[in-house]
Amino acid sequence: MPLHTDDVFAPSSKARLTTRDLGRFPEDTLFHRIARVVCGAGCLPRKELFEAWEVARRVRRRFRGGRVVDLCAGHGLLGQIMLLLDDSSPEVMLADPSLPPSSVTLSRALAAEWPRLDGRVTFREEPLDQIELRKDDVVASVHACGTLTDRVIEKAVAARARLAVMPCCHNLDVSDTGALGGWLDGPLAVDVVRASRLRAMGWQVVTQTIPREITPHNRLLIAELPRVAEEPSSPTARRR
């Protein structure tokens, strides 16, 4: 997907997309269709559209099916794009301690364009600790600030759920840099430690980035437990 990188329409802008921007998305691609719906809703910062799309399509290349759980979801576009990209997921939960009122506006606009979303999007305005995860979930979170990313990782690990996070706002006074500050800048060291800890626990880790012209906080950490081989048949079955 080509990015608009000119000064007038930078993908990193926090300006809201509105109907004035509809002409910038004329194609019949899924991204342009989503963008036109977002423009019509008139409530989403431009950078969130590009961030959600770039993260969702990378995660869906790795993880199919399962309930999608978008934690610290904000407007919830990430989770809903993931549902559009893979209709085998039964539903998406959008969870945030403080959901913006316009998250409902955006969800209704998306469901009007894609009726199959209707009834499959659940909002949970609750603290992160109160959200229950399941083993078959795909847990995603974009820019959960500081140690919130660590709490998202911890919850996914506890549930053995598939995980994708794109951290931001690293708190170097609290987060573990693994004594790597002499070689790496602080935020990168924190993310290296996060990935290394998951690997040490036996998780398969994939590290990627989205285009930096969208956000400087562009490191994407994707992880899952290896698939366990099927248990051998019972001794009785083997004797047969």
Where are the regions a protein language model picked out?
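Class I S-adenosyl-L-methionine
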Residues: 1-240
